[in-house]
């Protein structure tokens, strides 16, 4: 019997042995920087002249690796392979599929610091953020494997004396996985393994700025015994390969994590029925947020300031769950703001490969330019009291930025920034604070810092987000503990790491036999 699920513990880097082990992981990754990685279609490794070049966002001159780039023709080949492989994979035993996930999790656990080091180099994650990303990848595999074992025999339904009824789940078909750059291991691995353990075959198109960690994960799946053709690795451009596969009549479902605009585009394209298509495509989408921490006047103000700073600036604010707005009761606004500024000025920004770094770079030049444009907007809409500077000479570094005294209807309070910028806004009372928090087209995460039980219960009912936290920050959902997904334009509320997530990758079948 499989042991009960528990989340992978985070590494304590204050322990010297762990620090040394992580440094060894960095050395290992540095030893193979710049390598070429092929496409993988039906187990065949295919090298193309056209490449996706992955660079270190902390050092633009350092190439992490070059990954072959799929064309439409190769995407079509991958679709044919995945479609054919599905005919056998869908009949494979769920226990066997789960065992592959458990083996893959064990392999990653043994190579944990190596994978985290890839994330340091390719995604610009500081040690603790990279370690958490890798731990979450392990968690997804361990959790989804166990969930499949629970679902393999279906769910009991009622029968009558003269009949026997069964309710079971069967796989959907070929799934297109379009994974993000901000959690390029955890979310990519979670989306991929959820699809395959449910009996589907996969076309994996990772984010173009972080394809190397996905290529390394393909090695893990092969070592874990995954048959060729179940997961096909096809990095490529969204406009060429992504659109082609979303439109393809043999695509059964699309699992996407990324921006609102791209998510909407995928949703619209997937709704169109193409010639030869005999189903309605399913879309599983997580699309971002404009997340708020509300601070009540009856609250632990030190906890409030620490929660805001950690949630706003962890991984440079590049989390869909990051705190982008701090809405604070006017009676305690100045105290919380001043303390948050103090804490922010203590943060170190620099090379994430160095242990003491709190914040690394943003993802790429486009991200840098976008965030700095919002810093400029912040100068007009409020007062910059911390940060406000950026330097893209070597890498894409932006100082953690607090914009104070922002009006509730300002752009900084409405638009997703996806960087280390947080707007502070005053609220007249708790009801006003909740109204400001809900005044957005998103609904992903939120937090309330309060010692008032009535206010906590009011927020539990009225704060319209998919993941709501009390007296803590608004980031850091744990697989199996806080299933993750949001409302409104944050996506389809597909709760990753939750008990109903695998069912999104399957269809229910009822059989009834007369006795």
Swiss-Prot record:
The top EC class, named as a word, is: oxidoreductase
Q: Where does the record place the catalytic residues?
A: 286, 320
In the record, biological process GO terms are: glutamate biosynthetic process; proline catabolic process to glutamate
PROSITE patterns, per database record: ALDEHYDE_DEHYDR_CYS, ALDEHYDE_DEHYDR_GLU
| E.C. number(s) listed in UniProt | 1.2.1.88
UniProt keyword annotations, A-Z: NAD, Oxidoreductase
Query: Which GO cellular component terms, listed alphabetically, does the Swiss-Prot or TrEMBL entry include?
Result: cytoplasmic side of plasma membrane
Q: Which SUPFAM superfamilies match?
A: ALDH-like (SSF53720)
Record InterPro entries: Ald_DH/histidinol_DH, Ald_DH_C, Ald_DH_CS_CYS, Ald_DH_CS_GLU, Ald_DH_N, Aldehyde_DH_dom, Proline_metab_enzyme, RocA
Q: In which pathway does it act?
A: Amino-acid degradation; L-proline degradation into L-glutamate; L-glutamate from L-proline: step 2/2
Gene3D superfamilies with a match to the protein in the record: Aldehyde Dehydrogenase, Chain A, domain 1 (3.40.605.10), Aldehyde Dehydrogenase, Chain A, domain 2 (3.40.309.10)
Q: Which reaction does it catalyse?
A: L-glutamate 5-semialdehyde + NAD(+) + H2O = L-glutamate + NADH + 2 H(+)
User: Molecular function terms in GO for this entry?
Assistant: 1-pyrroline-5-carboxylate dehydrogenase activity
Q: Which residues form a coiled coil?
A: none
Q: Which family does it belong to?
A: Belongs to the aldehyde dehydrogenase family. RocA subfamily.
What protein am I looking at? 1-pyrroline-5-carboxylate dehydrogenase
Q: What is the lineage of its organism?
A: Bacteria, Bacillati, Bacillota, Bacilli, Bacillales
